[in-house]
């Protein structure tokens, strides 16, 4: 049975996982490709390939390079996709490659459908379908737009999760800084101002002499940060202490104090 209902049920089996775990975008693309016999590309707002699936016997080295190797569409092409506000179905191939500067398209009878992915009023990405020799019918478009809606919800959930994680990291750093004494805070400001990037070598005695504090103040400050999971430190004996920042919000919060 290949009715719209049966296809939707197959899709729902994937989507029902979304309550407990993230949806695998590749699974959605694979299913859509199977039931509609087409290429499927799930593209993020900035052109990143979130998922894809090629139909059988599809041969286009240019597209495969963009999707499989680069994992991103060129900016000019993605801008064209983003500017499309409503579903456009059954766009015929005009004989020119969709990527600028490539020239002639060697694949004939290609028909494309572009479905915007929107969530909470924001454009989140694009669902791009390509078929050869057969137009997409109404059932195909219903399934594609349903999938785009679900993907939009998942992208919104992922975005919210990122926002919550950012807030958590920031709160952890603020709490860690709040446990420092004035002299310890002064010490960490000097320590991390001398780091090149997210990690580096610290010689506590040199910083202690430079700032005019005891070495124990530096050691205590680092222990507090390490206990909070903000940094990781490893003694290298006479060479000093190797420090690695684990929470990227640390430097931003220290800059606010200055």
Curated annotation (Swiss-Prot):
GO CC terms of this entry: cytoplasm
Chief place where the protein resides: cytoplasm
Residues within the DNA-binding region(s): 204-223
Keywords annotated in UniProt: Cytoplasm, DNA-binding, Repressor, Transcription, Transcription regulation
Keyword Transcription regulation (UniProt): yes
Region (GAF domain), start-end ranges: 1-156
Compartment(s): Cytoplasm
Top-rank lineage group of the source organism: Bacteria
Family (UniProt): Belongs to the CodY family.
Designated name of the protein: Global transcriptional regulator CodY
Organism the protein comes from: Clostridium perfringens (strain SM101 / Type A)
Gene designation: codY
């Amino acid at each position: 049975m290949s009715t719209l209902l049966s296809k939707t049920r197959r899709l729902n089996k994937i989507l029902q996982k979304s309550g407990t775990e993230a949806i695998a975008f590749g699974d959605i693309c694979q299913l859509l490709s199977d039931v509609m016999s087409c290429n499927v590309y799930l593209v993020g707002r900035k052109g990143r390939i979130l998922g894809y699936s090629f139909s059988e016997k599809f041969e286009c080295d240019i597209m495969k390079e963009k999707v499989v190797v680069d994992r991103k569409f060129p900016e000019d092409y993605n801008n064209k996709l983003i500017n499309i506000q409503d579903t456009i179905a059954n766009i015929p191939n005009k004989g020119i490659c969709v990527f600028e500067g490539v020239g002639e398209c060697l694949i004939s009878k290609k028909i494309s459908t572009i479905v915007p992915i929107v969530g909470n009023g924001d454009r989140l990405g694009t669902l791009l379908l390509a078929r050869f020799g057969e137009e997409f019918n109404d059932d195909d478009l219903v399934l594609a737009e349903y999938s785009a809606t679900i993907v939009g919800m998942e992208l919104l959930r992922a975005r919210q999760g990122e926002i919550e994680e950012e807030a958590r990291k920031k709160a952890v750093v603020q709490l860690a800084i709040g446990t420092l004494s004035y002299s310890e805070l002064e010490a960490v400001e000097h320590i991390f101002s001398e780091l090149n990037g997210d990690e580096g070598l610290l010689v506590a005695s040199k910083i202690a002499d430079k700032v005019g504090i005891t070495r124990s103040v530096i050691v205590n400050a680092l222990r507090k940060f390490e206990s909070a999971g903000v940094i990781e430190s490893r003694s290298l004996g006479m060479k000093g202490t190797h420090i690695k920042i684990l929470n990227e919000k640390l430097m931003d919060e220290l800059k606010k104090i200055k």
